[in-house]
């Protein structure tokens, strides 16, 4: 008898931390990357959760720092023939699905995502087969193979709007893979949602009791929460949203002190947006609890300067993203549906 994969009990081995670089080494690799980007007609696309020095380099070279939805838009529209995707593997796959004519490079193809790892395609297909009457909606944080099974792909920035739209059509939903985001969307929309039970190893670690103590210490602070966090954390929030939405909330909220419950990589762009405000990390440990990710994705941390330089210089199978063409064509359908729907929201 086969055993159903249980993402709740899965323990993912973390990658080794990159070797720290000296100041001189960082300067060397920065200049090398800038030169190689020009020589290769390449542009950097970096996620908010990468390290600050990577985001800074993307800015300086005319690239993009954004959430996964805007990364997809930017990469597809940019005239560069090569995209250097600083993020995790599903982001590189998504770039290749949307831009098959372009060379897609990543600093490492071993940069995983616990949500992706927690949704193996064979088990997910069986889950969908058991509920054939439901519309399949998968989060962007999934493999190309899982996207290919879906009716829709969605990011956290438009999840509530999309599910509300599908609910208005009377559709019942399979949601995968993030259980916390699925629960949040269900609560916001009232839709009939059957959730896969995955979780982000970063957001799943935020602790309610420790956050309560921090709130008591700073009663004037607003709490900003990503909806991949547990429900108890979301319920404490003054603002809930995707990475880009949290940065927008930081600007509009009147509070001068902000407690932020998402990957601390976001602090680079958020501090730019609100230079006069104090940003505090929401706690991931306390009351005897320990943390593994400690508010920073270990796979995002693999996107170092040395690895980026090697990707641009060496190319090849160790850095280039490939997606089977038949799989790409199937995954493109729900991705295009997402982009078309997002365009209607932007007016």
Curated annotation (Swiss-Prot):
<dbReference type="GO" id="GO:0005829">
    <property type="term" value="C:cytosol"/>
</dbReference>
<protein>
    <recommendedName>
        <fullName>Quinolinate synthase</fullName>
        <ecNumber>2.5.1.72</ecNumber>
    </recommendedName>
</protein>
<feature type="binding site">
    <location>
        <position position="297"/>
    </location>
    <ligand>
        <name>[4Fe-4S] cluster</name>
    </ligand>
</feature>
<dbReference type="InterPro" id="IPR036094">
    <property type="entry name" value="NadA_sf"/>
</dbReference>
<feature type="binding site">
    <location>
        <position position="156"/>
    </location>
    <ligand>
        <name>iminosuccinate</name>
    </ligand>
</feature>
<keyword id="KW-0479">Metal-binding</keyword>
<comment type="pathway">
    <text>Cofactor biosynthesis; NAD(+) biosynthesis; quinolinate from iminoaspartate: step 1/1.</text>
</comment>
<comment type="similarity">
    <text>Belongs to the quinolinate synthase family. Type 1 subfamily.</text>
</comment>
<dbReference type="GO" id="GO:0046872">
    <property type="term" value="F:metal ion binding"/>
</dbReference>
<dbReference type="GO" id="GO:0051539">
    <property type="term" value="F:4 iron, 4 sulfur cluster binding"/>
</dbReference>
<dbReference type="GO" id="GO:0034628">
    <property type="term" value="P:'de novo' NAD biosynthetic process from L-aspartate"/>
</dbReference>
<feature type="binding site">
    <location>
        <position position="243"/>
    </location>
    <ligand>
        <name>iminosuccinate</name>
    </ligand>
</feature>
<feature type="binding site">
    <location>
        <position position="113"/>
    </location>
    <ligand>
        <name>[4Fe-4S] cluster</name>
    </ligand>
</feature>
<keyword id="KW-0004">4Fe-4S</keyword>
<keyword id="KW-0408">Iron</keyword>
<keyword id="KW-0963">Cytoplasm</keyword>
<feature type="binding site">
    <location>
        <position position="68"/>
    </location>
    <ligand>
        <name>iminosuccinate</name>
    </ligand>
</feature>
<feature type="binding site">
    <location>
        <begin position="139"/>
        <end position="141"/>
    </location>
    <ligand>
        <name>iminosuccinate</name>
    </ligand>
</feature>
<dbReference type="InterPro" id="IPR003473">
    <property type="entry name" value="NadA"/>
</dbReference>
<dbReference type="GO" id="GO:0008987">
    <property type="term" value="F:quinolinate synthetase A activity"/>
</dbReference>
<keyword id="KW-0808">Transferase</keyword>
<feature type="binding site">
    <location>
        <begin position="226"/>
        <end position="228"/>
    </location>
    <ligand>
        <name>iminosuccinate</name>
    </ligand>
</feature>
<keyword id="KW-0662">Pyridine nucleotide biosynthesis</keyword>
<dbReference type="InterPro" id="IPR023513">
    <property type="entry name" value="Quinolinate_synth_A_type1"/>
</dbReference>
<keyword id="KW-0411">Iron-sulfur</keyword>
<comment type="function">
    <text>Catalyzes the condensation of iminoaspartate with dihydroxyacetone phosphate to form quinolinate.</text>
</comment>
<dbReference type="Pfam" id="PF02445">
    <property type="entry name" value="NadA"/>
</dbReference>
<feature type="binding site">
    <location>
        <position position="200"/>
    </location>
    <ligand>
        <name>[4Fe-4S] cluster</name>
    </ligand>
</feature>
<feature type="binding site">
    <location>
        <position position="47"/>
    </location>
    <ligand>
        <name>iminosuccinate</name>
    </ligand>
</feature>
């Amino acid at each position: 008898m086969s055993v159903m994969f249980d993402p709740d009990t899965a323990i993912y081995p973390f990658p080794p931390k990159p070797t720290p670089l000296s100041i001189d080494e960082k300067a060397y690799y920065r200049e090398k990357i800038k030169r190689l980007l020009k020589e290769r007609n390449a542009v950097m696309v970096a996620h908010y959760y990468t390290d600050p020095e990577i985001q800074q380099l993307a800015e300086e070279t005319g690239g993009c720092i954004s959430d996964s939805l805007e990364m997809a838009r930017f990469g597809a529209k940019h005239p560069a023939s090569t995209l250097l995707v600083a993020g995790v593997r599903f982001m590189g796959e998504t770039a290749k699905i949307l831009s098959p004519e372009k060379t897609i490079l990543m600093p490492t193809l071993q940069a995983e995502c616990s949500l992706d790892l927690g949704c193996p395609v064979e088990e997910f297909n069986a889950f969908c087969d058991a509920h054939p009457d439901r519309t399949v909606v998968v989060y962007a944080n999934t493999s190309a193979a899982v996207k290919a099974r879906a009716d829709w792909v969605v990011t956290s920035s438009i999840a509530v709007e999309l599910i509300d739209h599908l609910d208005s059509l009377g559709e019942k939903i399979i949601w995968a893979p993030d259980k916390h985001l699925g629960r949040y969307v269900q609560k916001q929309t009232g839709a009939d949602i059957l959730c896969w039970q995955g979780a982000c190893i970063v957001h799943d670690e935020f602790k309610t009791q420790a956050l309560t103590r921090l709130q008591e210490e700073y009663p004037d602070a607003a709490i900003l929460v990503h909806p991949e966090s547990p429900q108890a954390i979301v319920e404490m929030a003054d603002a809930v949203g995707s990475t880009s939405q949290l940065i927008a909330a930081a600007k509009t909220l009147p509070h001068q002190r902000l407690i932020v419950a998402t990957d601390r990589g976001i602090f680079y762009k958020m501090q730019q947006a609100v230079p006069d405000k104090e940003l505090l990390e929401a706690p991931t440990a306390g009351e005897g609890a320990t943390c593994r990710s400690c508010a920073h994705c270990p796979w995002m941390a693999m996107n170092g300067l040395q690895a980026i330089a090697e990707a641009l210089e060496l190319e090849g199978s160790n850095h280039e993203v490939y997606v089977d063409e038949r799989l790409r064509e199937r995954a493109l359908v729900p991705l295009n549906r997402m982009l078309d729907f997002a365009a209607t929201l932007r007016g």
